[in-house]
């Protein structure tokens, strides 16, 4: 209807656990390699009119098992040098259409509710000009669509905080 297609990729998470069920979607354990590959894919995909990429899962979502329940404790240095560097490279060199936030928490804050990640880092520091979207069913009012709505150790991100943090779209969207 809108004649815009968004490829829900590339996945840019870092290979940290060989048992991660989605490592096949991610490029590398090296954030430089991940960033350069994602930027190349983004430029190629977005060279076609009306098609964009969604770099994901922003950020530090490096395990598939338990990813909706995990609170990653990461130092500022490790966050910037390992977990954000690939995203920074992709944004600065290719300007993807969208960034998708992840389900996990980083240092006690849901990534979808993190102003530090979505606005301060992505938009203000790196110059991201696209839109930010949540992963599917991340926020409380979208959770009823999915089986994992119950027994979340840290609860859901909230719609209000999603908007205040810098999300432009909560997925799945509705007409």
Predicted regions and their residues:
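Glycoside hydrolase catalytic-domain context in secreted enzymes
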Residues: 1-175
């Amino acid at each position: 209807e809108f004649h815009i297609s968004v490829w829900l990729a590339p996945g840019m998470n870092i290979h940290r656990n060989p048992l991660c069920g989605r490592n096949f979607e991610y490029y590398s354990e090296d954030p430089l390699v991940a960033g350069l590959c994602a930027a190349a894919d983004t430029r190629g995909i977005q060279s076609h009119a009306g098609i964009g990429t969604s770099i994901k899962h922003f950020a530090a979502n490096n395990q598939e098992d338990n990813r909706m329940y995990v609170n990653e404790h990461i130092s500022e240095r490790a966050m910037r040098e390992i977990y954000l560097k690939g995203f920074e490279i992709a944004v600065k060199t290719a300007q993807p259409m969208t960034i998708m936030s992840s389900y996990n928490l980083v240092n006690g804050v849901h990534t979808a509710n993190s102003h530090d990640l979505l606005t301060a880092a992505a938009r203000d520091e790196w110059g991201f000009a696209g839109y930010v979207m949540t992963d599917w069913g991340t926020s409380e009012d979208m959770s009823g669509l999915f089986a994992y709505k119950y027994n979340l150790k840290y609860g859901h991100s909230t719609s209000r905080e999603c908007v205040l943090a810098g999300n432009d779209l909560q997925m799945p969207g509705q007409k």
